[in-house]
Amino acid sequence: MRRRWIPSVLTSALLLTTVAVAAAHDMFLKPSRFFVPENSEVMVRLLNGTFTRSENSIARHRLKDVSVVTPTRRVPIDTAEWSAEGDTSTFHIHTRGAGTYVLGVSTRPSFIELSAEDFNLYLREDGIPDVLEARRRDGELGKPARERYHKHVKALVQVGDRPSDHYATVLGYPAEIVPIENPYTLKSGATLAVKTLVDGKPVVNQHVIYGGTTASGAAIEARDVRSDAQGIATLALSTAGTWYVKFIHMARVQGDTVDYESKWASVTFEVR
C-alpha cells in the first residue's frame, strides 16, 4: 500500500506541496549468519521492506537504541559504526564467549498521514484487523488518519555450541517479542511459545504473524495466530530455515496531534 510521509516541522500549507509517497515497510534484523563461532565478526543488516529485501535504509538520527546482549552484559553499539548506504542499513558485532546473543534496534517515532482509503488498505494488508474492524463498527471507514509509529526489532544469534538463557532478555522496548524457550534448543517440527509485550506488559489477543525462508531461499508460508490471556502466542516451526515473528500493536489516541499510535515488533532466528 502507499503512505504519505510528513515531516513534522513543515507547516500545513507546505505539506500540501511537499508530501512524499513511499511504500509501507516491515522491519527485520538479519545477521549474515545466525550460527557463529566464538571470537568472530558478524555483519548485520536491517531490512526495511520485507524479510528478503530492504527498500530504504534508516539514518542514524532515527535510532533510539542499538545494542547486543552477550553472556556477560548488554553492550551499546556505537552509531558511528552504523552504515546507511543505498537501501540497506548495516552494522557489525564482534562475538566473544559462547551463548545465545540478542541483537536489538529501536527507532524513534515518525509520523504519517493517510487518506481513508489508504489507511484502510494499510490495516488490511499489514495485519491490523482489529483497528479495521473498529473503524467499520464506528462508521469511520471514510475518515483519513494521522499515525505515530515506531519499530523495535531483535535477532537471536547462537555463538558457539552452548545455548544460554540470554535469549529471554527483555530489552525494554515499547513493543517486544520474547521467546519462552530458546529457539536454538529446538528442531524443525517443534513449537515455540513467545510472549508479546507492549510497554512491558503482556498483550492479550494480539495478532501475530510468522514465516521465513528455507536454506534454499524458498518462502515459508506466513501464518497468523493470536496471543492468549497471558500474552503468549504459540508457533509451529514446521521446517528448518530462518524465521521471523512480528506484530503491529495499534491503538486509538485521544488528545494528541495524531489519531493512532502503532508499535511494531519483530524477532528473527534460525531453526535447523
For the regions a protein language model found, what residue spans apply to each?
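N-terminal, post-signal-peptide region of Sec/Tat-exported proteins
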Residues: 47-83
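Glycine-centered loop-to-beta-strand initiation motif
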Residues: 85-89, 223-241
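Short acidic/polar inter-strand loop motif in beta-rich domains
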Residues: 108-116, 251-257
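N-terminal signal peptide c-region/cleavage motif recognized by signal peptidases
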Residues: 18-19
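Bacterial N-terminal signal peptides that target proteins for export
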Residues: 1-10
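Beta-strand-rich domain onsets/edges
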Residues: 25-42, 130-192, 197-203, 215-218, ...
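Short, ordered, surface-exposed loop/turn motifs in non-cytosolic proteins
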Residues: 59-61, 201-212
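Short amphipathic beta-strand segments in non-cytosolic proteins
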Residues: 65, 69-74, 207-224
